[in-house]
Amino acid sequence: MKEQEIQENMNKSIEATQRNFNTIRTGRANASLLDRISVEYYGAETPIKSLATISTVDSQTISIQPFDISCLQAIEKSISMSDLGITPNNDGKVIRINVPPLTEERRKEFCKLASKYAEEGKVALRNIRRDAVDKEKKDEKDGLISIDESRDNQSEIQKITNKFIALIETKLSEKEKEILKV
């Protein structure tokens, strides 16, 4: 694998980890909280952001304005059934969600969830590293590159992996600070 290809794959893993982090509640209203929620709409699971305009009114309130009023109840039901622990208020045209402050216990749960997402990201990075190292070993075995080149390349792959793992650790600590901030 080329160095650039490895970095591209690792960047995709970092982006996926960041998307997971964005779905964790922090006690502040954030439209990305609803990214993982899908609505049963005309027989198909559809993301809320495809059915409505989602905006944050203030630090505690999210507003959802459906493009089609007929899906208002379905959106409300999907939010209620989600694991976010928030209750939508439907006024007939717009759904408002008041995001209550998190309890200490809930904050700790979300920190554990963030750690889990970070670990999944690190595992993905290690899998990319393993595939790249295996390719280097195969090229060495097939005589395409020398033992020294193979070891140098493997060392470089490890350095890249360490850099990306440190990036995930940084993002995790930022997310934990955000979650624990009262």
UniProtKB/Swiss-Prot annotation:
Subcellular location per the Swiss-Prot or TrEMBL entry: Cytoplasm
GO biological process: translational termination
InterPro entries in the cross-refs: Ribosome_recyc_fac, Ribosome_recyc_fac_dom, RRF_sf
TM region positions: none
Family in the record: Belongs to the RRF family.
Protein known as: Ribosome-recycling factor
Coiled-coil positions: none
GO cellular component, as recorded: cytoplasm
Keyword terms, alphabetized: Cytoplasm, Protein biosynthesis
Record organism: Prochlorococcus marinus (strain MIT 9312)
Domain of life where this protein originates: Bacteria
Cited CDD domains: RRF
Molecular function terms, GO-annotated: ribosomal large subunit binding
Free-text function comment from the UniProt entry: Responsible for the release of ribosomes from messenger RNA at the termination of protein biosynthesis. May increase the efficiency of translation by recycling ribosomes from one round of translation to another.
